[in-house]
């Protein structure tokens, strides 16, 4: 891969996908990052956790998050470019995913408010009443500085993986709305204008089946704050998204969808974010490789550039292959999501296929991205651990994306479940049939089915090995198929 391709997210996207939708808008967005946005991002990362002004001088609760003015200008660039509104105008998630990839190459933290604002808009559009959509959807789709931001608040103090056991926020009916009381411990995009929130209606059963999803605005009908921010988290990275602890005290909210389908709606929100997280991890990997290539081409060791040493070049080329495989798998999850993002329960087989691909993609990409970023630090030697140089940041950022929207452990177990309960692996093998080598496909099918036939304890304990193998097999198969279309000569050489 040419270094100029590696240095540019748009060039890399074009290399992987061929013709891009809205290419002019994508290049204009990249240009803004190169000329202005990157400086804002660096300053935001170095400044650390922003201040929280809880009260104004008159003693009124305001909960203002105090970033520098340049931060807010930078944040709005993505909204103006279309990270939310283009999805509804195009009736496709592709442009939003591409804009998110570019964003993550420069500032992974900013992808979070963009993605969860999109997830808020999609959940509202799919499951909100006509009155709710008319009132709250237009502000999320604005293209100027008045655009609203969304958020998705599920996690509480006891943890986010086991929502059925750990969500203690209670919802009480109050006329045409509900009143929510509880605390959200990891509330990304604290200060958002609108949030979708997991809560348990009074009298609902314990466990995940008793949860429902609610739409909660920042302000009550009377204009007062509808939720308060207890504090902001001091994170190792993604400092451009304020993550806080949010207190709900009889906070006004509206039910989305039906009360008995809440868990499905919550998972819809999470799975959209998982697919975009997979692409984001690869954007970080690309950035880390670009930084290491630039440095290694200039650094002289033993009489020649580090990049020209055979072992270094081999290691670099191996990681470029991993980058391209990971991107192909992440993009496959976007393609499968694009087929089903408007579906409602009960879901089709295509939706269960998307779920499996999303788990595979989120698991593998977020696992390999920190490894690539750590290697990029190693290329820099001792300079790689100094905060004054850019490469250490990408390792910090990659580690956060491993945790976001469910750990690797969670992705494996959820992926195992969708294979066991929905037979999603059969759908995946059918999807890959025309692109995969028949012998390799048969062997992978045999391995998966053999594993699923094991006793439950053995099946879970050994799940990572088979899940990793299936992720890599899927990644390489869909990449080869895509290259056969977009780069036929190159694909033939690989074959």
Annotate each PLM feature:
Residues 352-383:
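Charged, glycine-rich active-site and insertion segments that engage polyanionic ligands
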Residues 274-344, 426-487:
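Extended amphipathic alpha-helical segments enriched in small hydrophobics
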Residues 177, 181-226:
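A short core secondary-structure module
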Residues 57-146, 188-190, 404:
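Internal helix-loop-helix
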Residues 1-89:
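Extended, charge-enriched "interface" segments that sit outside catalytic cores
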Residues 4-8, 383-442:
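Glycine-rich phosphate/cofactor-binding loops in nucleotide/flavin-utilizing enzymes
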Residues 222-226, 230, 235, 242-273, ...:
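A glycine-rich, basic-preceded beta-loop-alpha segment at the flavin cofactor/substrate interface
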Residues 128-176, 331-351, 358, 373, ...:
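Internal maturation/activation junctions in enzymes
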């Amino acid at each position: 891969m040419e270094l100029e391709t590696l240095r540019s997210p748009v060039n890399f996207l074009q290399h992987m996908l061929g013709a891009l939708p809205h290419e002019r808008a994508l290049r204009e967005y990249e240009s803004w990052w190169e000329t202005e946005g990157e400086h804002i991002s660096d300053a935001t990362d170095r400044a650390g956790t922003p201040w929280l002004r809880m009260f104004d001088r008159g003693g009124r609760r305001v909960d203002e998050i105090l970033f520098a003015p340049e931060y807010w200008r930078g944040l709005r660039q993505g909204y103006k470019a279309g990270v939310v509104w283009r999805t509804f105008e195009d009736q496709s998630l592709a442009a939003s995913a591409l804009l998110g990839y570019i964003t993550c190459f420069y500032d992974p933290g900013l992808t979070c408010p963009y993605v969860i604002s999109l997830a808020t808009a999609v959940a509202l559009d799919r499951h909100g009443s006509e009155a709710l959509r008319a009132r709250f959807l237009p502000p999320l789709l604005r293209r100027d500085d008045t655009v609203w931001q969304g958020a998705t608040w599920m996690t509480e103090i006891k943890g986010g993986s086991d929502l059925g056991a750990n969500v203690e926020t209670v919802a009480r009916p109050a006329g045409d709305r509900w009143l929510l009381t509880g605390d959200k411990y990891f509330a990304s995009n604290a200060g958002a204008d609108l949030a979708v929130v997991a809560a348990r209606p009074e009298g609902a059963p314990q466990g995940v089946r008793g949860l429902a999803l609610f739409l909660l605005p920042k302000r009550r009908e009377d204009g007062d704050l509808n939720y308060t921010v207890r504090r902001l988290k001091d994170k190792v990275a993604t400092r451009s998204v304020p993550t806080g602890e949010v207190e709900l005290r009889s906070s006004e909210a509206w039910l989305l969808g039906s009360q008995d389908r809440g868990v499905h709606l919550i998972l819809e929100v999470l799975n959209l974010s998982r697919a975009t997280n997979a692409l984001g991890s690869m954007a970080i990997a690309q950035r880390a490789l670009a930084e290491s290539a630039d440095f290694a081409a200039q650094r002289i060791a033993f009489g020649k550039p580090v990049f020209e040493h055979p072992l270094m070049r081999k290691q670099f080329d191996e990681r470029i292959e991993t980058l391209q495989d990971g991107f192909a798998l992440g993009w496959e999850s976007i393609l499968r999501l694009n087929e089903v993002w408007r579906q409602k329960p009960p879901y089709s087989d295509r939706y269960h296929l998307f779920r499996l691909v999303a788990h595979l993609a989120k698991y593998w990409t977020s696992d390999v991205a920190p490894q690539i970023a750590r290697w990029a630090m190693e290329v820099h030697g001792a300079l790689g651990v100094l905060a004054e140089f850019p490469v250490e940041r990408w390792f910090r950022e990659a580690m956060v994306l491993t945790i976001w929207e469910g750990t690797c452990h969670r992705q494996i177990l959820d992926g195992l479940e969708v294979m066991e309960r929905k037979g999603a692996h059969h759908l995946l093998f059918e999807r890959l049939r025309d692109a995969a080598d028949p012998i390799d496909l048969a062997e992978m099918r045999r391995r998966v089915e053999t594993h699923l036939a094991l006793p439950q304890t053995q099946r879970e304990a050994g799940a990572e090995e088979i899940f990793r193998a299936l992720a890599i097999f899927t990644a390489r198969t869909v990449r080869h198929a895509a290259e056969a279309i977009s780069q036929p000569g190159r694909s033939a050489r690989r074959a």
